Amino acid sequence: MITIKQYEQGKGGKFLILEKENPAGEMTYRWEGKDKLIINHTGVFEEYRGKDYGRKLIMKGIEYAKEKGVKIVPQCSYVKKVMERDELLKDMIFTE
């Protein structure tokens, strides 16, 4: 069983994915102004790779951004690739 927990601190935070209460990966973010959520890192620990945990973290981040009514700046190359390739996620990318 997996769970995703969110931790916020100041102008940033992270989502931590747990498998049987063991940390399996994380995605970090920071706020820029009130309309941009910058996702700057996504990583899944080696022994947990291949289980789609990175995408699960991204989807949790997108859900969070939607709740807050903001767009995402995908500084993390993996997040950018996933969002640009999925037509349903492209509209969540912040554009100037």
Regions inferred by a protein language model and the residue ranges of each:
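Conserved acetyl-CoA pyrophosphate-binding loop and the N-cap/start of the following alpha-helix
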Residues: 48, 52-57
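Conserved beta-hairpin
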Residues: 13-24
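Conserved acetyl-CoA binding element of GNAT-fold acetyltransferases
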Residues: 36-46
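C-terminal structural segments of small proteins and small subunits
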Residues: 64-96
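Active-site rim helix/loop that mediates acceptor-substrate recognition in acyltransferases
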Residues: 1-14
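A conserved beta-strand-loop-helix scaffold within acyl/acetyltransferase catalytic domains
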Residues: 9-10, 27-36
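Aromatic/hydrophobic pocket-lining residues that form π-stacking "cages" and hydrophobic walls in ligand
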Residues: 61
